[in-house]
Regions:
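Jelly-roll (double-stranded beta-helix
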Residues: 1-452
Length: 452
């Protein structure tokens, strides 16, 4: 029986020939793209001979038999297969990178914690050199929890590449632009944007603005558990919050460098190094739904109270990673964006709270309304489960007495990594000079006002 002839149709999005950045829209879509016309096979994943002499290779992000709605995989068509990347690994020091379980490094007593911004480096420092862990939770061996990192850098990753088998990376730039060059292509992100890099995908981070742009700084959540996805909207309906159309996935881009380079692999909390004779970012075409993406947080459409009371912060959830308990996240990524406050006869800042979840917060820019002093851009706070927190004394006094009129919170963007698991500060975080030991004093002036 003769082979069935297939129509010569390709669904691939062709990258710009001039190397300009381009992206495809949607969240969790099955994308198809090629950097060279004809590089993506038509109607087959693994033809007997892949086009242009490329190798076909699959990266699985889930078990083969995972339900269709959660099944993740991507097909690469690359110059050399990844089996050439995995030889001669040797373990190297982890530096300031830590992985859960990591419970015994800190001797800090329980309490509300806050740090001033991580200092920017003077010595040459790339993203991997400047990555350091502030807190961890869960257990990478059972694939639950996450690590909260910060990064600082003043140079690009020159002939240096990174891959983590422990979790997906959620990158949150706070100062300066970064270019994330993955096996799928290139994404540039500035403060106010985020990037997700899938687990097991090789990438490097460059500074597209060079020395003129100055050093960069930001936050990272390394998610060990179920992958981040868009939260259910429930009674909100079909619109608002983060809309899938606003997520951008890169079109194919590749490096064809025949020069020695370094690949660092993170696995089971350890770092391993190997030397390659060529760049591992040599994917000329790809298709699938396990791909990196970026999102502009300013496109988040917030909802809120239009009459009275401050709603729960969960209404500002951008992304969520489920745990085994419905509605109780392994990791939520929540933002506090620009918005209107119109509630009548109500205390408008976030209220005083003891949360069964643990909260790691950062400020990307502007002023956070519950902490107008002391919590500055680049800073961080950690409120573990059931530790009380809330507006400082000055914020309480102002919000309790001001004349209420419609008010726009402008020029502000804070975020929160929230988890069901207790967050353990690392030894590095516990010993930093930037640890604000006076933080609990911000509530000291809250006076007794009870009268009968």
């Amino acid at each position: 029986m003769d082979a069935v002839e297939l129509p010569a149709f390709s669904e691939a999005v062709l990258s710009p020939a001039n190397g300009a950045l381009a992206a495809m829209t949607g969240f969790g879509n099955s994308f198809a793209t090629e950097a060279v016309r004809g590089a993506l096979p038509v109607a087959r994943n693994s033809p007997q001979q892949a086009p242009l002499g490329l190798y076909a290779e699959q990266l699985s992000g889930s078990a083969f038999t995972a339900p269709r709605q959660s099944n993740k995989r991507i097909w690469f068509y690359r110059i050399r297969p990844s089996v050439l990347h995995g030889r001669n690994f040797r373990e190297i020091e982890c530096g300031l990178i830590r992985t859960a379980p990591c419970r015994d490094e800190s001797s800090l007593p329980i309490g509300q914690l806050r740090w001033q911004p991580t200092p920017l480096p003077d010595a040459p420092t790339d993203f991997l050199d400047g990555l350091r862990t502030m807190a961890t939770c869960g257990d990478v061996f059972t694939q639950v929890g996450f690590a909260s990192h910060v990064y600082v850098a003043n140079r690009s990753m020159d002939r240096r590449y990174f891959c983590t088998a422990d979790g997906e990376f959620l990158l949150v730039p706070q100062q300066g632009r970064i270019e994330v060059f993955t096996e799928c292509g290139r994404l540039v992100a500035a403060p106010g944007e985020i990037v997700i890099v899938p687990k097991g995908m090789k990438f490097k981070i460059d500074l597209p603005d060079g020395q003129a742009g100055g050093p960069v700084r930001g936050y990272v959540a390394e998610n060990y558990g179920h992958y981040l996805t868009l939260p259910e909207r429930g009674p909100i309906g079909a619109n608002c919050l983060a809309n899938a159309r606003d997520f951008l996935t890169p079109t194919a881009a590749y490096e064809d460098h025949e020069a020695a380079c370094e690949l660092i692999m993170k696995s089971q909390g350890r770092l391993y190094h190997t030397t390659l004779p060529h760049s591992p970012l040599d994917v000329v075409a790809w298709h699938g739904n396990f791909a990196p993406c970026k999102y502009d947080l300013r496109r988040f459409s917030p909802v809120g109270s239009v009459m009275f009371d401050h709603p729960d912060p969960s209404i500002y959830t951008v992304l969520t990673a489920a745990s085994d308990t419905p509605g109780t996240a392994n990791l939520d990524f929540v933002i506090f964006p620009e918005r209107w406050l119109v509630m009548e006869n109500s205390f408008r800042p976030p209220w005083y709270h003891m949360n069964v979840m643990s909260e790691f917060m950062g400020l990307i820019y502007g002023v956070y309304d519950a902490k107008p002093g002391g919590f500055v851009p680049g800073g961080m706070s950690l409120h573990n489960a059931l530790l009380p927190h809330g507006p400082d004394a000055d914020a309480f006094a102002k919000a309790s007495t001001k004349t209420l009129a419609p008010e726009r919170l402008s020029g502000t963007l804070a975020f929160m990594f929230e988890t069901r698991y207790p967050l353990c500060p690392t030894g590095y975080a516990s010993e930093l000079d930037t640890l604000d030991t006076m933080y609990p004093d911000c509530w000291e002036k809250l006076e007794r006002k009870f009268k009968v």
